[in-house]
C-alpha cells in the first residue's frame, strides 16, 4: 500500500533504467522560505508486553527535561499505540507504518513514519575458516570514529562537531559528562578489542563456526564459570543483583553475577522495575519475596560452557535456551511542516524514499547498539565494573528491555540520531534531482549528441534559439518577480529527453553547482539514483476573469493520489515496426511524466469507475481519491449527461484508455481521430472527442521544464488554453500577488513552447499591471500583438527566426534580435561551469 501511494513508478522497478525521469524538475522558482520551519522528531519506543511501552530516546528530550512519555496525539490514541498497533505477532522483520497525525496547531501538519522491528539476537556469524565477518567491537569503534571518510559529506565527524553546538539534541550532554563517557567507551573498546583477539586465537583450535558478536561481548567482558550446585535453583542459573550505571544515573536493576555459590536472596528478585515515582508500588511487592509470578531467571545451559577456560566457545543466542525474550522496538520519525509548505511540497510523497531509507539505516544502527548494550548489561558482574550498563526491566511475559529514557544519555545513540536528523535536513534542502547527471562529462556527452543530430539550418537555428531563450528567461526571473515554464514537444522521446538534460542546469544552476558538495546521490536516493519526488499535492484554481473567456477550474485537494502517468500515443514513433514489449523500447516510445491523476485525467477513465469499460480493469488498481466527484463533470466541456454518453459503445472509443503498467505507472492511450471525425464532433450533440477537447487542460503546475508528445495537450492555437495556463502562473502560490500589486509592481508570466518536430519556437506572455497604471501602459499594448481579456493582457510572438535579446523592463516595446552567438559558442565548448558563470554574470 505504501508503495502504490508514495513511490514513483520507476523508482521501485528493479528492471528499469536508472536514467529515466531525470527530466522531472521541482516546480518552485526558489527554495521555499519555510523550509527552515520543517521540524524532525525521532523517538525510539520499546514494548515489553503487559501494555508497557517505554520511551527510550526522544530527540526533543534535552536539557534534562523529559518530554511527554505518552506521546499523545491531539485527538487520537497515544502515539505509542499507533506505532505498535495492527501488526500480527507472527510477523517477522521490519515493518514500515505511516500515520497522518493531528497537528499541534492549525498552522502545521504532522506525519509519522514508523519502523517496527525486533533486535537480531543472533547477529552475524563466523565463517568456516574462522575469519570474523563482524566483530563485537565494530559498533563501538565505528560509532566513536568518523561517520564517513569523505570530509565533504555532512555526515562526517567534522560536520557532526560543527553542528553539535547548534543541535538541541546534543546540548543535554554537558562538558563533563561527554569526556567521561567517551573515555569509558574508548577504554572499553580497547579492552574488548584485545580480549576479542585473544579469544579468536583460542577459537582457532576449536571447531566453533557460529560465534556471534553478542557472545564475543560475553567472552571479552566477563568470564562465566560453571555454577555451583544450588538446591534452590537450577545448577546453571545466575542470580541478578543491583548495580549502578554511570551513563544513566539510575539503578542498574539486573546484573548477572558470576558468583552463585551463595544462596539466592528472595528480596533481590531479578529484573526489578526502575527506581522512579511510578514504580514504588511494584518495588514494595517485590520486597515481599516469594512472589508467585516472579519472572524466570536467565539460565545458561551446560552445553555452552567450557570448564577448562573462562570463555564461552560455541553458543547460540542467549535468549534461545531460556524463556526470556527481547522486547519489540519502534523507531518513529515525526515530521511537522507549515501548512503553506505542505500545500506546495507534500513531504511524504516527495521524500518518501529518502525518509524510509534514512530511518531504516538508523534502525540498523540502533539494532546493533541495543543488542550490545543488552548483553553487556546482562553480563555485568555484581562488583559494578561495567561502564556501559543500562538499567533493565522485565515484564511478566518474560520480555527484557530497558528503563524509561535509558538511552537518553548514551553518546553513541545520540550521535546516530543527530546524524540522521542532519541528513534529513540536508535532503530536504537539496534539489530533487540527482546532481551527478549534470556533471561536466555527462553534459558534454549529451551536448555533443544533440549537435550531431542538428544537421539542417533549421535544426541548428532552433538549437541556438532555444538555448538563448532559456537563458533570457532565467535572467529575467532572477531580476524580477516573473514565473515561466518551458514545454518541449516531440514525437521522439529520446531527443526530447536530451534537450531536457541540456536545459535543466541552465534553469537550475544549483543542480550543477551543488553536485560536488551534496551528499552521495546513492545515499540520498539509493533505489532509483534519481529524484524521489512525486507530483505535488496542492490546491489551485484559475482565477475568474470578465469577458467571454472560459477558464476551467481545477480541484487538486487530493490526499495520497500522487501518481506517475505515462502518456503515449496509440501510434508508436516506430510505426513501421511492430510494437515490442521490452522495457527499452517501452521507455523510448513513451513519456515518463508525473501528474496529479484526478486533475489531469478525466474521471470517466478512472480504472475504478464501473462505467469506463472492462478494458480498464487491471489486477493493480488505485483507490479513488476524495474530492473528485464534484468536478468530474467539468473534465469535459459542457457535458450534462455523462452516463448517457458513456452507454454508447461508439462514443467509448473516443475516450482515453487508462491501464496500470509495471511499477504502478498509469498508461494513458490517446486515440487519434481524423479531421472528418473532429468536424463531426464539433457539430454533434455528443461531447467532443479527447483529440479535440484536449486531454490536459493546463501545464503541470509543479514543473518548470516539461516534455510531452504534441497530441497530449490542447492545441496551442487555442487562446483559452494559453490564457488559462498563464493566468494560473500569475496566481502562483509562492508569490503574494496582492502585496506585489500594492507595491506597484508589474507582474508577468511567460511560457515558451518548442516543437522539436517542426523546429518552431513560440513565446507567450501575460502581464498584469496595477490599477494606477491605467494610462501608462497604453503605448505598450499594440493591437496587432495583444488581446485584452478583462484587466489582463495577453501577448504572443512567433520567434522562429530568432530569440529576444533584451527585455525592456520598462513599459516600452520589445527589441528582438538574433540568438546570442557568444553564449551559444560557450555552450558548444561543453564547459558547464563556464556556461553557468556566463549565465550568472550577464
Swiss-Prot record:
Residues 777-842 form the dDENN FNIP1/2-type domain. Residues 35-422 form the uDENN FNIP1/2-type domain. Keywords: Cytoplasm, Phosphoprotein. One of its GO terms (biological process) is positive regulation of TORC1 signaling. It comes from the Eukaryota. Coiled coil: none annotated. Residues 183-209 have a biased composition (Polar residues). The modification Phosphoserine is found at residues 573, 590. It holds the Pfam family FNIP_N. GO terms for cellular component: FNIP-folliculin RagC/D GAP; vacuolar membrane. Residues 1-20, 142-209 are annotated as: Disordered. Residues 430-772 form the cDENN FNIP1/2-type domain. It is found in: Cytoplasm. Its main location: cytoplasm. This is Uncharacterized protein C30C2.07. It comes from Schizosaccharomyces pombe (strain 972 / ATCC 24843).
Amino acid at each position: 500500500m505504501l508503495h502504490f501511494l508514495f513511490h514513483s513508478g520507476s523508482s521501485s522497478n528493479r528492471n528499469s533504467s536508472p536514467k529515466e525521469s531525470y527530466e522531472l524538475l521541482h516546480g518552485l522558482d526558489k527554495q521555499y522560505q519555510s523550509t527552515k520551519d520543517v521540524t524532525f522528531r525521532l523517538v525510539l519506543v520499546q514494548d515489553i508486553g503487559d501494555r508497557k511501552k517505554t520511551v527510550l530516546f526522544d530527540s526533543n528530550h534535552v536539557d534534562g527535561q523529559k518530554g511527554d512519555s505518552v506521546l499523545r496525539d491531539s485527538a487520537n490514541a497515544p502515539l505509542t499505540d499507533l506505532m505498535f498497533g495492527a501488526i500480527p505477532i507472527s510477523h517477522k522483520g521490519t515493518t514500515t507504518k505511516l500515520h497522518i497525525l493531528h497537528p499541534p496547531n492549525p498552522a502545521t501538519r504532522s506525519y509519522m513514519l514508523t519502523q517496527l522491528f525486533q533486535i537480531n539476537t543472533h547477529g552475524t556469524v563466523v565463517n568456516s575458516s574462522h575469519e570474523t565477518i563482524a566483530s563485537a567491537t565494530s559498533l563501538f569503534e565505528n560509532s566513536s570514529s568518523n561517520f564517513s571518510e569523505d570530509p565533504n559529506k555532512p555526515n562526517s565527524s567534522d560536520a557532526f562537531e560543527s553542528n553539535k553546538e547548534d543541535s538541541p539534541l546534543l546540548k543535554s550532554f554537558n562538558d563533563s559528562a561527554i569526556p567521561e563517557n567517551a573515555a569509558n567507551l574508548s577504554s572499553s573498546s580497547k579492552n574488548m578489542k584485545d580480549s576479542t583477539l585473544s579469544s579468536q586465537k583460542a577459537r582457532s583450535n576449536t571447531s566453533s563456526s557460529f560465534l556471534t558478536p553478542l557472545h564475543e561481548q560475553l567472552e571479552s567482558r566477563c568470564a562465566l564459570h560453571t555454577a555451583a550446585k544450588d538446591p534452590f535453583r537450577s545448577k546453571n542459573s545466575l542470580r541478578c543483583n543491583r548495580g549502578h550505571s554511570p551513563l544513566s544515573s539510575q539503578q542498574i536493576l539486573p546484573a548477572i553475577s558470576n558468583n552463585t555459590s551463595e544462596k539466592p536472596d528472595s528480596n533481590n528478585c531479578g529484573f526489578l522495575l526502575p527506581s522512579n515515582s511510578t514504580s514504588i508500588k511494584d518495588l514494595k511487592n517485590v520486597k515481599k519475596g516469594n512472589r508467585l509470578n516472579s519472572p524466570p531467571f536467565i539460565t545458561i545451559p551446560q552445553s555452552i560452557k567450557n570448564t577448562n577456560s573462562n570463555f564461552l566457545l560455541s553458543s547460540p543466542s542467549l535468549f534461545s535456551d531460556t524463556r526470556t525474550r527481547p522486547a519489540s522496538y519502534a523507531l518513529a520519525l515525526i515530521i511537522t511542516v507549515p501548512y503553506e509548505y505542505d500545500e506546495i511540497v507534500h513531504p511524504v510523497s516527495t521524500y518518501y524514499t529518502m525518509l524510509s531509507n534514512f530511518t531504516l539505516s538508523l534502525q540498523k544502527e540502533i539494532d546493533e547498539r541495543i543488542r550490545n548494550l543488552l548483553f553487556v548489561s546482562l553480563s555485568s558482574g555484581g562488583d559494578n565494573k561495567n561502564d556501559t550498563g543500562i538499567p533493565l526491566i522485565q515484564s511478566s511475559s518474560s520480555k527484557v528491555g530497558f528503563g524509561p529514557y535509558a538511552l537518553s544519555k548514551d553518546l553513541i545513540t545520540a550521535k546516530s540520531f543527530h546524524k540522521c536528523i542532519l541528513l534529513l535536513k540536508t535532503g530536504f534542502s537539496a534539489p530533487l534531482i540527482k546532481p551527478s547527471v549534470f556533471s561536466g562529462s555527462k553534459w558534454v556527452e549529451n551536448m555533443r549528441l544533440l549537435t550531431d543530430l542538428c544537421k539542417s539550418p533549421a535544426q541548428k537555428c532552433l538549437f541556438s534559439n532555444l538555448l538563448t531563450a532559456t537563458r533570457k528567461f532565467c535572467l529575467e526571473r532572477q531580476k524580477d518577480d516573473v514565473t515561466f515554464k518551458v514545454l518541449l514537444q516531440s514525437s521522439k522521446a529520446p531527443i526530447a529527453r536530451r534537450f531536457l538534460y541540456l536545459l535543466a542546469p541552465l534553469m537550475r544552476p544549483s543542480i550543477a553547482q551543488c553536485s560536488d558538495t551534496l551528499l552521495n546521490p546513492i545515499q540520498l536516493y539509493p533505489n532509483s539514483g534519481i529524484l524521489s519526488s512525486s507530483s505535488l499535492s496542492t490546491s489551485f484554481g484559475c482565477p475568474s476573469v470578465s469577458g467571454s473567456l472560459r477558464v476551467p477550474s481545477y480541484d487538486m485537494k487530493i490526499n495520497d493520489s500522487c501518481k506517475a502517468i505515462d502518456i503515449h500515443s496509440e501510434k508508436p514513433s516506430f510505426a513501421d515496426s511492430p510494437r515490442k514489449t521490452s522495457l527499452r523500447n517501452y521507455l523510448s516510445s513513451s513519456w515518463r511524466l508525473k501528474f496529479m491523476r484526478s486533475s489531469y485525467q478525466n474521471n470517466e477513465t478512472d480504472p475504478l469507475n464501473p462505467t469506463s469499460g472492462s478494458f480498464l480493469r487491471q489486477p493493480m488498481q488505485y483507490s479513488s481519491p476524495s474530492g473528485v466527484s464534484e468536478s468530474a463533470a467539468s473534465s469535459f466541456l459542457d457535458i450534462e449527461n455523462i452516463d448517457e454518453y458513456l452507454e454508447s459503445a461508439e462514443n467509448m472509443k473516443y475516450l482515453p484508455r487508462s491501464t496500470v503498467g509495471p511499477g504502478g505507472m498509469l498508461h494513458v492511450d490517446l486515440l487519434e481521430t481524423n479531421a472528418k471525425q473532429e468536424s463531426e464532433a464539433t457539430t454533434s450533440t455528443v461531447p467532443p472527442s479527447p483529440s479535440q477537447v484536449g486531454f490536459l487542460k493546463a501545464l503541470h503546475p509543479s514543473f518548470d521544464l516539461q516534455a510531452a508528445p504534441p497530441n497530449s495537450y490542447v492545441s496551442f492555437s487555442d487562446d483559452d488554453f494559453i490564457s488559462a495556463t498563464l493566468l494560473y502562473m500569475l496566481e502562483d502560490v509562492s508569490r503574494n500577488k496582492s502585496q506585489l500589486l500594492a507595491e506597484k509592481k508589474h507582474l508577468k508570466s511567460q511560457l515558451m513552447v518548442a516543437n522539436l518536430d517542426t523546429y518552431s519556437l513560440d513565446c507567450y506572455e501575460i502581464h498584469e499591471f496595477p490599477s494606477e497604471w491605467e494610462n501608462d501602459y497604453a503605448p505598450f499594448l499594440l493591437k496587432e500583438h495583444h488581446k485584452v481579456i478583462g484587466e489582463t493582457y495577453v501577448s504572443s510572438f512567433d520567434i522562429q527566426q530568432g530569440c529576444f535579446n533584451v527585455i525592456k523592463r520598462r513599459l516600452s516595446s520589445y527589441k528582438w534580435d538574433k540568438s546570442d552567438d557568444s553564449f551559444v559558442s560557450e555552450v558548444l565548448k561543453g564547459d558547464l561551469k563556464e556556461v553557468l558563470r556566463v549565465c550568472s554574470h550577464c
